[in-house]
Amino acid sequence: MRQLYQATSRSTRLAGSKGFTLIELLIVIAIIAILASLAIPQYLKYQRKAKVSSYAEPIARGCMLDIVAFCTENPGASVTTASLANCSLTTVSTAGGPVTLSANGGTCQSDGQADSAASATATLSGVTDYTAVCNYTNQSIKCTIKG
């Protein structure tokens, strides 16, 4: 019996073991699951931010452009955002869903520049953690995605 065991053992060593054990496969699957659990939430977060950037930010920027144009044409006037084409709608339909816009035009400066307090904020429906905010600073419009 002992000779049979030694012969079997020797042939196994000579042939070499091929393949993976069940434990090795389970460890690899566990590592992949851990990596996926970390990566998927980050991907979804990035996807929501991209939607706000694509759908809400252009609406806020358009409103700010109207405010700047109004101030260029009407120096010293008080801006009524409801009378501006791109600021008049508080909810705009987009391919990504409804976008809610709120704007503050402030008062135009006497040299035709927009007020530094002028701002437009757009929020995409269904995305609560990011908003598009456009401000007028240093004679230019700056839009950011805040979240």
Residue map of PLM features:
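N-terminal leader/signal peptides at the extreme start of proteins
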Residues: 1-20
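N-terminal single-pass transmembrane signal-anchor helix
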Residues: 15-44, 48
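Transmembrane alpha-helical core residues of multi-pass small-molecule transporters
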Residues: 32, 60-61
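Aliphatic-rich helix starts adjacent to a transmembrane/signal segment
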Residues: 43-60
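Periplasmic/extracellular, small/polar-rich flexible segments of pilin-like filament-forming proteins
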Residues: 65-147
